[in-house]
Swiss-Prot record:
Subcellular location: Cytoplasm
Protein name: L-seryl-tRNA(Sec) selenium transferase
Gene, per the UniProt record: selA
EC class name: transferase
EC number: 2.9.1.1
Subunit comment: Homodecamer; pentamer of dimers. Binds only one seryl-tRNA(Sec) per dimer.
Entry GO terms, CC: cytoplasm
Family named by the database record: Belongs to the SelA family.
Cofactor section: pyridoxal 5'-phosphate
Function: Converts seryl-tRNA(Sec) to selenocysteinyl-tRNA(Sec) required for selenoprotein biosynthesis.
Species whose genome carries this gene: Salmonella arizonae (strain ATCC BAA-731 / CDC346-86 / RSK2980)
Amino acid sequence: MTSETRTLYSQLPAIDRLLHDSAFLSLCDQYGHTQVVDLLRRMLDDARDVIRNTQTLPDWCADWAQEANLRLEKAAQSALRPVINLTGTVLHTNLGRAWQAQEAIDAVMQAMRAPVTLEYDLDGAGRGHRDRALATLLCRITGAEDACIVNNNAAAVLLMLAATASGKEVVVSRGELVEIGGAFRIPDVMRQAGCTLHEVGTTNRTHAKDYRQAVNENTGLLMKVHTSNYSIEGFTKAVEEAELAEIGRELDIPVVADLGSGSLVDLSQYGLPKEPMPQQLIAAGVSLVSFSGDKLLGGPQAGIIVGKKAMIAQLQSHPLKRALRADKMTLAALEATLRLYLHPEALSEKLPTLRLLTRSEASIREQAQRLQARLVARYGDEFTLEVKPCLSQIGSGSLPVDRLPSAAMTFTPHDGRGSRLEALAAHWRTLPVPIIGRIYDGRLWLDMRCLEDESRFMEMMLK
């Protein structure tokens, strides 16, 4: 060790001395003595590494309290940070999918603050069933005989198969063997559930006779899977749920359907593309229908199964149900969300997902133009700011082909360098409330469809 290195080491302060400083006393009050001491030890190690490698002190050694405060603030940030989603994808899987309605938020807060009647029957003063209240609501909305709630739709599909067809064959069209995000594949789920996949038809064409010919003494289910995240077009043929349900009745084999997204209202009345509805499948005679809570329904993450009472009873009594059941916060949020559907006239106002999906292009463009004018002074020296038409997407595998006309604020660097766009996007991601856009065609696009809190957006953009 050189004398210069020894001199630099000697300039590093002792932890005890730092802890008596008023700034560190304040940090100890805020973050706790243990956490501050642990941090100071790491900072000393960092400083020694810099000295050893560069023969200099780190710049932050000039103000240990300031550096400690910055590091503690960063460490204290939640891993689930609120962001401003301007990607153009409304139900963005990586950003948490559906926003919750205020009614759902209030219900969750109430469920967290005090004991609730999760599995308690007030009338009988004994044990109740956690799905009962929601089952009543779901039956009212969908026309089903009963319902079952689990923690997501993948779990719902697994439970349906395991409880009703384990050890048996499940007949599915080749064109419906979907894979969703995270490599969730229908054939893999069947294998995990103990079922044997029996493919029928071809990728683009499946006929009623294909299902009939596939049935044998070991057939447990006929299954329909809604291809919510892709579309097969052209020379195609598929057997609709009503026809498949008729085949099932004729052959005395239950028919189940995985809708994926699942919408409880006819979206076409709001000018949106039509999506299959659980109530339509129930009316057609499908025995069990599963769908998600946090996609088009606009609620919390949940897997919902509606259908025949006897088959729902099979699901409720299966050992997997306990492993996959939803907790009280999820059930509270889902119940509050479902109650909004009892007042359909106000649904597009109260349900954030529907409110965002139904925003008009004109209102989005007006908002973008108004905010752009206020941001030119901040960004105009380096970027050209324009408002351009764009197409939003629903996201989370819902209506993959359809796009929603929207408007975006775009940033184009004067010098044409893509690195400036990357740097700007990276800067926005470091903000206290990160702003997430997308880079495309030499511009950084901020699709304004999902922007509701303008004041917070402007506060972040002007930093």
